[in-house]
């Protein structure tokens, strides 16, 4: 049993609780506030980036189904 103790300690090491450092979160307002126009551009860009390709694929599903097999 004495020879298994170091191996057992190695296996239990990942199971021990790790001390997670505290995040440095600032409660101050932004130095340069984002204007409504910038927010609108950003939201539009995100919308187009994520939903644009999905919309393209969904609108062309019938074409993909009819594509001749090679």
From Swiss-Prot:
Span of the transit peptide along the chain: 1-24
Mitochondrial intermembrane side: 60-70
Membrane-traversing stretches: 36-59
Residues on Mitochondrial matrix side: 25-35
Keyword Transferase applies: no
Topology within the bilayer: Single-pass membrane protein
Involved pathway(s): Energy metabolism; oxidative phosphorylation
Key words of the record: Membrane, Mitochondrion, Mitochondrion inner membrane, Transit peptide, Transmembrane, Transmembrane helix
Family: Belongs to the cytochrome c oxidase VIII family.
Annotated PANTHER family: CYTOCHROME C OXIDASE POLYPEPTIDE VIII, CYTOCHROME C OXIDASE SUBUNIT 8B, MITOCHONDRIAL
The protein's assembly and partners: Component of the cytochrome c oxidase (complex IV, CIV), a multisubunit enzyme composed of 14 subunits. The complex is composed of a catalytic core of 3 subunits MT-CO1, MT-CO2 and MT-CO3, encoded in the mitochondrial DNA, and 11 supernumerary subunits COX4I, COX5A, COX5B, COX6A, COX6B, COX6C, COX7A, COX7B, COX7C, COX8 and NDUFA4, which are encoded in the nuclear genome.
Record protein name field: Cytochrome c oxidase subunit 8B, mitochondrial
Organism: Ateles belzebuth (White-bellied spider monkey)
Name of the gene this protein is made from: COX8B
């Amino acid at each position: 049993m004495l020879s298994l103790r170091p191996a057992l300690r190695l296996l239990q090491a990942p199971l021990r609780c790790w001390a997670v450092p505290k995040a440095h979160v600032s409660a101050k307002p932004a130095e340069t506030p984002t204007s409504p126009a910038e927010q609108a551009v950003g939201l539009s860009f995100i919308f187009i980036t994520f939903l644009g390709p999905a919309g393209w694929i969904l609108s062309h599903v019938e074409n993909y189904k009819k594509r001749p097999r090679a």
